[in-house]
């Protein structure tokens, strides 16, 4: 079953990831015997990250003042500075920052996704619109799609595609004593796919999430049970599939 005939992707503006506690990414360097300098990274969180390294006071090298790379593994080599004069060392100072996501990846726009429920179950997806479109009558963002699914009984949500769990939010409890139109925050599971697309599933009971951070899931893998939405007999899933990209015409190097 194809859940999406159109491209269900949300073009997300570049937003810096703010780390709390231990840094999810660390970069160190080694000075080699040939006077080159190799930079290595360690990543303690799952998923892809875009890393930007900035250099100041570069001497004895023709290297650029900044380097940008998407990293996916837990560790590896990031880049190497080579000396212009092999007999002398390279002088430098460096800093770095990182952003969550596989930016400007080669997305498979015609990939067939399956429904996020038990095989053979009949469901009616409701297409969602942006706030700007609803309240300001503006045009829909290009390549933007999201859906909700409503049920009168609890449902088990399943993965629509193979991927790795990159984020789990399980802090919230629904208000079941009154009717609620909309929650600004929901318990959610975020899964990154091989081509850089990301699926966000929202609406879980915080005690019924079945996956762990970093776990690989497959189509029809159980993710978790939906929470009762409010005082009604209503269980609702919000599903969004998107990818990360920079603003058209704006270089990563110019984003501060």
Show where each model-derived region lies.
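Cationic-aromatic interfacial patches
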Residues: 22-75
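Acidic, glycine-rich catalytic/binding loops that coordinate metals and/or anionic ligands
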Residues: 113, 209-218, 222-256
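A short acidic/small-residue loop/turn micro-motif
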Residues: 173-174, 206-207, 231
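Surface-exposed, glycine-biased beta-strand/turn segments
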Residues: 70-185
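Bacterial Sec-dependent N-terminal signal peptides
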Residues: 1-26, 41
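Active-site region of chymotrypsin-like
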Residues: 188-213
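Short alpha-helix capping/helix-loop boundary micro-motifs
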Residues: 63-64, 149-152, 203-211
């Amino acid at each position: 079953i194809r859940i999406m005939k159109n491209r269900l992707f949300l073009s997300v503006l570049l937003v810096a990831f703010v780390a709390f506690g231990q840094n999810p990414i660390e970069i160190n360097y080694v000075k080699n015997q040939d006077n080159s300098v190799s930079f290595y990274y360690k990543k303690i969180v799952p998923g892809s990250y875009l890393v930007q390294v900035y250099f100041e006071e570069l001497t004895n090298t023709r290297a650029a003042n900044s380097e940008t790379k998407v990293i996916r593994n837990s560790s590896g080599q990031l880049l190497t500075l080579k000396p212009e004069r092999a007999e002398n060392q390279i002088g430098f100072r460096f800093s770095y920052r990182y952003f969550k996501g596989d930016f400007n990846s080669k997305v498979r726009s015609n990939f067939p996704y399956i429904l996020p429920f038990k095989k053979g179950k009949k469901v009616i997806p409701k297409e969602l619109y942006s706030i700007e479109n609803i309240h300001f009558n503006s045009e829909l963002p290009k390549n933007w799609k999201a859906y909700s699914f409503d049920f009168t009984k609890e449902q088990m949500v399943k993965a629509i595609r193979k991927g790795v769990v990159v984020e789990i939010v399980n802090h919230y409890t629904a208000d079941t004593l009154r009717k609620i139109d909309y929650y600004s925050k929901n318990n959610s599971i975020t899964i990154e796919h091989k081509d850089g697309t990301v699926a966000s599933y929202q609406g879980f009971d915080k005690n019924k999430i079945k996956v762990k951070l970093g776990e690989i899931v497959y189509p029809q893998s159980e993710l978790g049970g939906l929470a009762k939405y409010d005082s009604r007999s209503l269980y609702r899933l919000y599903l969004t599939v998107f990818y990360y990209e920079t603003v058209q015409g704006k270089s990563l190097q110019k984003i501060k």
